[in-house]
């Protein structure tokens, strides 16, 4: 598989400046009594400096959407168009999360010059996360960076290393404090005041934010036993995956894309519980479909839900012939473009100041949401315990002999992408790489062999 030129740099130890590389490699294998060779702040800001001691975490991160954040062609296209349409007034709204270190160091003010910057300034880097020592707000990246050279993490007793290290609850996936750090960028409010991305807010309102429940990293950074660093005296302990899959995937050749896709599919397959009931009703035969966001720690879908689409595909057959269909969408066809009065699509709609629907998020002044809520309580006596959604579909007579359903999803849909292509902000070749996922756990099939009943 081809990888981008930037990630050939990330994944090659020889991309380190020769002197810096020698320093780090020497520092990774001292005796227990040797004083470590300390890295400078400038060296710590370069992810390549992390590779010799943290090879596994580095390679996972290098194939992550965090590393890809400023290279993503849709981000580049939307940021370019946003800056043009707002005459630069949007400033760091996008790049503040997609290349935050470059913003903090004054290397960019709007993200339009990212292609000219060194790789160490691009994406969400190791230093940016591990130098964070406080969260000073709830959205649009209010993280505070320390300048003391201490790399913070979730290990309470770090060993000697080429940098100073300290425990931080913000970096401990067992601590709910860590969710506030993730939420700093995974909640976005536009200049007109619309809360367009609400993943942290959704988690905060869910069962998972309660004491003893799960922070973001428990799902998105799987744990395993291993060494956190290849330094003398480093014990085997619980470490976690830095590939951080969710639903977005690289749309250009990129290192680790296959692993990223597999991680996404694993999460999606374990998100929903579904039920398909085919019944005889007073009005005829109906299909009742229930979708339950049982296991995501936020709504489904989440994040940039004005651009995401998840939808139900429901098809009925009689004698092998299709007699009813809803949600059957062709490749590269926008879900909302199909004529389908029964379409069940999960998404946000955004509206500008004139109350006109827009898919350009920076114009958004308000949001209408139709997403599946996360679990809010584990108490079956609490009315909020029941949060699934059921819809009923009238089926044609005579009754079908087979009915199938599945839930499909796109991280971005083609109404937005086609628009970006039409303004020449996005290369049309990117559209061929946009995935359509199928949630494996959502597939259900009813046949008349067992009579009218529910399948779950």
Regions found by a protein language model. Give the residues of each.
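Aromatic-lined, polymer-binding surfaces characteristic
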Residues: 91
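C-terminal motif of bacterial Sec signal peptides marking the signal peptidase cleavage site
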Residues: 25-27
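Bacterial N-terminal signal peptides that target proteins for export
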Residues: 2-18
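Bacterial signal peptide processing site
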Residues: 29-31
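Outer-membrane beta-barrel channel domains
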Residues: 95-100, 130
